[in-house]
């Protein structure tokens, strides 16, 4: 085989299509509909995200325990049923090569592949592919058929298996049914029952790419190149068939879902070892997506009028590619075909750019999916050729060509990571096939000692309060440790005490120099305690940090005249630097934390919007967000000890003064001339300076919904309720990552 460029560049490459599916029109928004509050006042904070997915939309009821129901499931029987389904072809959607494996792999990949590392959103952890917009994205065309094929299995096992688990488990079963040894599988994903409202991009049409600026700089936190795609356009950037340019898109988008070059190459080559794409004919004959389809189609979309519309006449992506001579068997044939031919640019019957083995080489070596007597020429996607043209991918895949066992191992690990990246630590996984924790799962050590009891807790609190550390220092450190948690992908939190490790110890928001001093004091308390104990009782630094915050809150409540006990459950452990992927953890660094009145320089989004997003990450309701902001201001816990929003003359006492003084009509607010994003409050009569604030503070008086909540806590009889609600919300945040307590 020649070592020269394997692709022929002759001919016109003007794209006639924008995307993987060039013919699916965008839905048309209703032009004349009643306006809602968001239409009239789009700049107000969107608080509804804090109250989504409540029991009101969940038919299972508040007492439903998925783990308990799953424990009753015969997982081996489930696997047999799913594998049997693979080769039971249905006339209404016939299986290519008599096997649905390729279809189910694509379904699982696309369910999990929406995950993005920047904010942890997306992924397969909630079964969101069942709902708009994902169920109707161009890249998910005809995956509605895959889900319908699975319905008899879901119907049989009912509440013992969630759709979220089944959608990704099916792909795992598909791989095993075709001879591949997977790395493992964890169940435990719970279904949502309404669409996830999240930012998928600025475009208002399918396949738009307004998300780019400059030299093809992709806007954060997005992980796909165009609206409605999972990753990249397989024809090449904006339909231009350039494998090297496509490699740039591939590297960027896959890295945004936490995949490196090896994992990326393994996923593409491994996934494309199976099945085919579908572009049999004129794609103008394909009907609307599921959400836009007529009611009589019962949620099935993309009905095609080309021929029979199914089987040999199916149109999905507009591409008509079969990668290997063995599309229902695991082997090394994808790489053998990729490197075994030179390639020339051609078009599918639907008009999409793809590549065919040059000069008729290999003609007849690729089987037809429905006619065993017919053969095809080898074909590839533009993005497949990227694995050969890009120097870094080429180095990886050429080695695999001669070392297929390494390829199989890397694909197994990458596939496992793809399906589980948004599930958090392995303590959340269910079932018998869970392998040992991987580095990307942010492992923490198991508890290997006796836990502290009430007497030890009381003694430690005393030592902490006598240490010379202030209430703001203790509160801020505990908050900084716990509030890294993201409910989107279950990462971060206080368990592991990673606040003392890189990169967290060096984040600006954590005031590294002061943090180091605080942690040294707390570590000394921990060491002194552990060395004085007998009977195997010990305490981790992670527990000491959280306990220190609890002690500080109790002292602040006492300063305000209230005796409270902040709940505390020991059992956290301390991770090591070796258990902490610095690059992976870097994405958890807050760009804003309104609870501490922190806003990183250069942020473009409004601070109050970022506060709501942070509250969403912490799984807080609007009332919980409100009481925490007010309480943390009273505790003087701002970043850098600024006085913005500290509306009290008795800081470090857990009072409702923030709300009382915010709602005081005797104060007039104006933007400060001396500082950006700061407001000055003056006496309405005398003009004397009273307070300073940020938008995060003032939004609780400006926004009507938040003001209504602030009024609850500003009332004369609200002090006790305020303290109780603050303690409850504080305890919730401290335990967000304690999945062992669920």
UniProtKB/Swiss-Prot annotation:
> For bias kind Polar residues, which ranges apply?
11-20
Which top-rank group of organisms is this from? Answer: Bacteria
Q: Which organism is it from?
A: Rhodococcus jostii (strain RHA1)
Which reaction is recorded as catalysed by this protein?
A: H2O2 + AH2 = A + 2 H2O; 2 H2O2 = O2 + 2 H2O
The UniProt site entry described as Transition state stabilizer is assigned to 106
Among InterPro entries, the record links this protein to: Catalase_peroxidase, Haem_peroxidase, Haem_peroxidase_sf, Peroxidases_AS, Peroxidases_heam-ligand_BS
The subunit structure is: Homodimer or homotetramer.
Function of the molecule = Bifunctional enzyme with both catalase and broad-spectrum peroxidase activity.
Locate the region Disordered. 1-43
The answer to keyword Zinc-finger applying to this record is: no
Which co-factors does it depend on? heme b
Q: What is the lineage of its organism?
A: Bacteria, Bacillati, Actinomycetota, Actinomycetes, Mycobacteriales
Q: How is the cofactor bound?
A: Binds 1 heme b (iron(II)-protoporphyrin IX) group per dimer.
Q: Which GO terms describe its biological process?
A: cellular response to hydrogen peroxide; hydrogen peroxide catabolic process
Gene name linked to the record:
katG
- The location annotated for the cross-link Tryptophyl-tyrosyl-methioninium (Tyr-Met) (with W-109) is 231-257
Q: Which UniProt keywords apply?
A: Heme, Hydrogen peroxide, Iron, Metal-binding, Oxidoreductase, Peroxidase
Q: What is this protein called?
A: Catalase-peroxidase
Give the similarity note: Belongs to the peroxidase family. Peroxidase/catalase subfamily.
On modification after translation, the UniProt record reads: Formation of the three residue Trp-Tyr-Met cross-link is important for the catalase, but not the peroxidase activity of the enzyme.
**Pfam families documented for this protein:** peroxidase (PF00141)
Positions annotated as active site in the UniProt record:
110 (proton acceptor)
Q: What are the EC numbers?
A: 1.11.1.21
Q: Name one GO molecular function term.
A: heme binding
